[in-house]
Amino acid sequence: SDVYKRQAWKRWTLGQLPMLPPRFGIKLIDQKSIQHQFEVIKKLVASAEEIINCGDAGQEGELIQRWVMQLADVKCPVRRLWISSLTDASIKQGFNDLKPDKDFNNLYYAGLSRAIGDWILGINATRLYSLRYGEPGKVLSVGRVQTPTLALLVGRHKAVSYTHLRAHETR
């Protein structure tokens, strides 16, 4: 994103931490195929009288669909299909029970808060750990999900290695 273009943040130093931009925003990925598909979506929503948000039923699905609609500058009413099963009966019931998108605002805000928190943690902790504990020029990537997952994998590897070592010693 544009945050990396900020002159003050180009060099990695402890003095620049914490890195907190004045505002957060969304930006389309700079890839031709994605931009082309988004232009198709943008043209379709420009002429829509109503949109039915059929994104995944959950925080992440709500966030992604809202971001797409924000970037596409959706002006028409939006209703939400909320289903967790793809059976014919479930889909029919879901379309009979569409809700206004405002009913899901708190879910969107929760997802947005998580995304911003992940960014703040990731960029600041990655720079801190890379500068403090890494080798010059090497990045020690830190994140809310990846770091504890890696810790679980390392712990499991150590447990298996220790078990093999103990089994070898008793032979």
Predicted features, each with a name:
Residues 3-7, 163-170:
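Conserved small/polar residues in nucleotide/adenosyl-binding loops
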Residues 1-119, 123:
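Intrinsically disordered, low-complexity regulatory segments
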Residues 91-161, 165-166:
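C-terminal or mid-to-C-terminal helical accessory/interaction module adjacent to the motor/catalytic core
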Residues 54-56, 144, 168:
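Alpha-helical architecture
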